[in-house]
Regions:
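OB-fold and OB-like single-stranded nucleic-acid-recognition modules
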Residues: 21-165
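Sec-dependent bacterial lipoprotein signal peptides
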Residues: 1-21
Length: 165
């Protein structure tokens, strides 16, 4: 029978490898089933809840003490990343405390955030009237662009033969 102490290095290595695959953003404690469109129709659905929403930034601006992002929402996948191939779930306004560099949080970037809905706000999308739920952001993750992903160093571990082009 193998010595339990001899298995410890293998277990530690396995834990490090599995942990390296995890997302940097944890939304487990937040409710991601309620869409912004549902909350725009009935704000009570979001009362006393931490919400997780994500999507594509469609507008952004810095205000005196916070940054406002208008986001077209999409359902979140198991990693908390917006699934942009799914049907959008409406738009929302995210208010992030403090200053965000809008060059980084530009139109088209993908974000996931958690927070609480504080109100709904009447506005417009183009000429069409629209009701936006307003999310007070607690945590936010800016997903890497395809270019950033392509330039990220890749680490491969294993035994075998491979070809890199």
């Amino acid at each position: 029978m193998p010595n339990p102490k001899s298995r410890m290095p293998v277990l530690l290595l396995a834990a490090l490898l599995v942990g390296g695959c995890a997302t940097h953003f944890d939304i487990d404690a937040a409710d991601d089933r309620i869409t912004p469109q549902q909350v725009a129709n009935d704000i009570k659905l979001a009362q006393n809840k931490t919400i997780a929403w994500g999507g594509t930034i469609v507008a952004s601006k810095n205000l005196a003490n916070q940054t406002q992002l208008e986001v077209l929402s999409y359902p979140l996948d198991k990693n908390g990343r917006p699934d942009r191939e799914a049907k959008p779930g409406g738009r929302f306004i995210a208010l992030h405390p403090g200053y965000l560099e809008l060059a980084n949080y530009a139109i088209g970037r993908v974000v996931t955030m958690t927070g609480t809905v504080t109100e709904t706000r009447a506005g417009a999308v183009g000429e069409a009237p629209y009701v936006f739920p307003v999310l007070a952001v607690k945590t936010m993750f800016l997903w890497p662009t395809a270019e950033e992903e392509a330039n990220k160093p890749q680490f491969h571990f294993g035994v075998g033969v491979g070809i890199v082009r």
